[in-house]
Design a protein with these regions (language model features):
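Hydrophobic, aromatic-enriched alpha-helical segments typical of multi-pass transmembrane helices
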Residues: 2-318
Length: 318
């Protein structure tokens, strides 16, 4: 290799297992509480924020097209309210305090979520020092941006709806897309990508080090995808389920004590690949099906007597 080319540094050695386990023991309960609180806030917040407003009528007979609006203007007539304005008025009549409370809870859920990300990142990096800091940075930025963006976008949208005093579609759209709403939506989008990136990398690397089972690791990556494509899990059910389960994993409590061994040893203990698992199962099955070796048959003579019977006859003759 040319001396002019930069030498690739070897990865640092894993952190001492005793140090890792001591740190995890001191912080695992706090991380588990963060997971359970985030799960509860996510599911309850999504229900409350949509309470009474999830089935907005379509008002198909109140659609105002562009030609209709132009004709009304040319004739000196006011533009009729239109479907968007009718929907905003309907939403206004169904808006309640529960919607505001649910929005705040959803925003807080994202902030609390960072406690889960930080703990799992620290535990994973202790067993795999090559795991980059970018995941933690993306998780921190994503949690703040997602939480603030959710709260700002929905709260200002609710305020705009509550202050709507009638009008046409244009005025209704202005009420729904005021300046703070747009800023909140931008933050929400950026935060979604940050959390999605963090969850996918955390799920993959925690699974590789043996901290997460294959099911939990793959589910973490799916949860990351739902941040970017919220239509897959609009109520956050998958996210809440994963958070509730990971809380029990953090405190090493699970039925049958089926906790991943890496949490106990403090070292990386990767899960075997699917091919290796199948080979191990096949080997165990072959071992069970192999018959035990049979004992050799006693030697016989032409007269039909066994060797033992012949020895007895010789003794009698003597």
């Amino acid at each position: 290799m040319s001396p002019l080319l930069p030498q690739k540094k070897p990865p640092p050695p894993p952190q001492d297992a005793a140090i890792s386990l001591a740190w995890e023991a001191a912080h695992r309960r706090r991380a588990a509480i963060c997971a359970w609180v985030a799960a509860a806030l996510t599911i309850i917040g999504s229900i409350l924020s949509a309470l009474g407003t999830s089935s907005v009528p379509t008002f198909p007979n109140d659609v105002v097209t562009a030609p209709d609006a132009i004709n009304n203007l040319l004739a000196g007539q006011p533009i009729p309210p239109g479907r968007t304005a009718m929907q905003v008025e309907w939403f206004q009549s169904h808006l309640s305090a529960a919607n505001y409370v649910g929005t705040v809870m959803s925003g807080l859920a994202a902030l609390v979520l960072f406690g889960v990300i930080a703990f799992l990142f620290k535990a994973t990096r202790a067993r795999n020092p090559g795991f980059g800091q970018a995941t933690l940075i993306a998780g921190a930025f994503g949690a703040v941006a997602f939480g603030v963006g959710t709260t700002v976008a929905q709260m200002t949208s609710f305020i705009g709806i509550a202050g709507f005093d009638g009008g046409n579609n244009f005025q209704a759209t202005e009420a729904l897309t005021a300046g703070p709403v747009v800023i909140g939506q931008i933050l929400l989008t950026l935060g979604s990508f940050g959390l999605g990136f963090a969850f996918v990398l955390l799920g993959l690397n925690a699974m590789r080090t043996g901290l997460l089972t294959r099911f939990m690791g793959i589910l973490a990556m799916i949860v990351g995808a739902t941040f970017i494509i919220p239509q897959v899990d609009p109520q956050g059910v998958l996210r809440s389920f994963w958070l509730a389960v990971i809380g029990f994993v953090f405190i090493l409590r699970w039925p049958g004590n089926r906790i991943p061994p890496a949490w106990i040893s403090g070292k990386s203990e990767p899960w075997p690949s699917i091919a290796a698992s199948r080979a191990a199962k096949a080997g165990a099955s072959d071992a069970r099906s192999t018959p035990a070796p049979s004992l050799p048959e006693p030697e016989s003579t032409g007269s039909g007597d066994t060797a033992g019977q012949l020895r007895k006859k010789r003794k009698r003759k003597k």
